[in-house]
From Swiss-Prot:
Coiled-coil stretches noted in the UniProt entry, renumbered to this chain: none
Sequence repeats (start-end): 6-23, 30-47
Tissue: Calcified shell.
Protein name per Swiss-Prot or TrEMBL: Cuticle protein CP498
Keywords, in A-Z order: Cuticle, Repeat
One annotated GO molecular function: structural constituent of cuticle
Domain of life: Eukaryota
Length: 50
């Protein structure tokens, strides 16, 4: 079974559904919630529904 929350590291995110998202150089996660993450460059990553 897939984990119920994202795994977040310095260089990327593994979403609850198993999707790997690599962060651009110098970009970090400034806010993480149960369904998305806000990045320091203003972008956001929406996690897929489980």
């Amino acid at each position: 079974a897939a984990p119920s929350k994202a795994t977040v590291g310095e260089s990327g995110i593994i979403t609850p559904g198993g999707r790997l998202i690599q962060l651009p150089h110098g970009v970090s996660i400034i806010l993480e919630g149960p369904s998305a993450a806000l990045l320091s460059n203003g972008d956001f990553v929406t996690y897929e529904s489980s």
